[in-house]
Regions:
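Structural and coupling elements of P-loop NTPases
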Residues: 1-172
Length: 172
């Protein structure tokens, strides 16, 4: 009854920002089963089309494909508009917190890793392969802070705690 009264009294309207210049914010990066980089963003204003060139902090990049995810499944679409959450294939130079399009800025994470650890590798594991895998994970979580010490031939990473370390061990 209360909700019905609220619905009657309050008029909800969604502002239409689709006629403005495109602007979006990157909030997550993952990799699909084919190893392609999947950049998740929220469209804050304007429209974004597949095959369109957009402004990114390092210059311009082409949107090869647009996806709308529902769990693990996705639908390929030709266009997304203000308010949509989507995934983009084709952006290689962005990180979580970056904006793309008309307004460029980076909003860094407020979190700071509490531990720095040296990654110990068994002789059967090629160090460069492990470094490559860690760099891919670093794209998804920039706070990982992967560092390669050439002189000591050691890999160092920054982590939030022991649970993250256990998760990394299982992922790798």
């Amino acid at each position: 009854e209360f909700l019905a009264a609220m619905h009657t009294l309050v008029q909800w309207r969604k502002e239409d920002h689709s006629n403005e210049e495109f602007c979006g914010r990157i909030y997550k990066i993952r990799h699909d089963r084919q190893g392609r980089r999947v950049v998740f963003l929220k469209v804050e204003q304007g429209l974004l089309h597949a095959k369109e060139e957009i402004i990114v902090p390092s210059g311009q990049e082409k949107v090869d494909e647009l996806r709308i995810y529902e769990g693990e499944k996705f639908t390929t679409v030709q266009q997304v508009s203000a308010g949509d959450l989507c995934a983009v294939i084709g952006l290689s130079e962005v990180t979580p917190g970056d904006s793309v399009g008309a307004r460029l800025f980076h909003q860094p994470s407020q979190l700071v890793p509490m531990m720095a650890v040296r990654v110990q590798v068994g002789k059967e594991v090629p160090v460069q392969a492990l470094l490559s895998a860690l760099r891919q994970l670093e794209e998804e979580d920039p706070l990982l802070g992967v560092e390669w010490n050439q002189q000591l031939e050691e890999i160092h990473i920054s982590i939030m705690g022991t649970i993250q370390l256990e998760v990394l061990q299982q992922v790798l």
